[in-house]
UniProtKB/Swiss-Prot annotation:
PANTHER family: DNA-BINDING PROTEIN HU, INTEGRATION HOST FACTOR SUBUNIT ALPHA. The keyword Transcription regulation applies. It comes from Ralstonia nicotianae (strain ATCC BAA-1114 / GMI1000). This is Integration host factor subunit alpha. Heterodimer of an alpha and a beta chain.
Length: 104
């Protein structure tokens, strides 16, 4: 399955919007910088029709070293989660091609 990169997003802006390549790259970088800065400040980011980036605090918990079996603490941390909007989920579900039946 192919992956869309920031460079490819900039190229698409160049082709579809008519910005020059430098402006396209700068716009993509600025977009992600704004999202990154909002999350760093503890804000959620809601993109209508796309989804929400939210912060979630995970408490400290016990973990286990798989080699020694020793119990070690996993420190508390903050993680970023993404929840796709219903609209995005519906669009993705529409495009799913059924798996071919196995020849058994």
């Amino acid at each position: 399955m192919p992956t869309l990169t920031k460079a490819e997003l900039a190229e698409m802006l160049f082709e579809q919007v008519g910005l020059n390549k430098r402006e396209s790259k700068d716009m993509v970088e600025a977009f992600f910088d704004v999202i990154r800065e909002a999350l760093e400040q503890g804000d959620s980011v809601k993109l209508s029709g796309f989804g929400n980036f939210q912060l979630r605090d995970k408490p400290q918990r016990p973990g286990r070293n798989p080699k020694t079996g020793e119990i070690i603490p996993i420190t508390a941390r903050r993680v970023v989660t993404f929840h796709a909007s219903q609209k995005l989920k519906a669009l993705v579900e529409e495009r799913v091609e059924p798996m071919p039946a196995s020849a058994a």
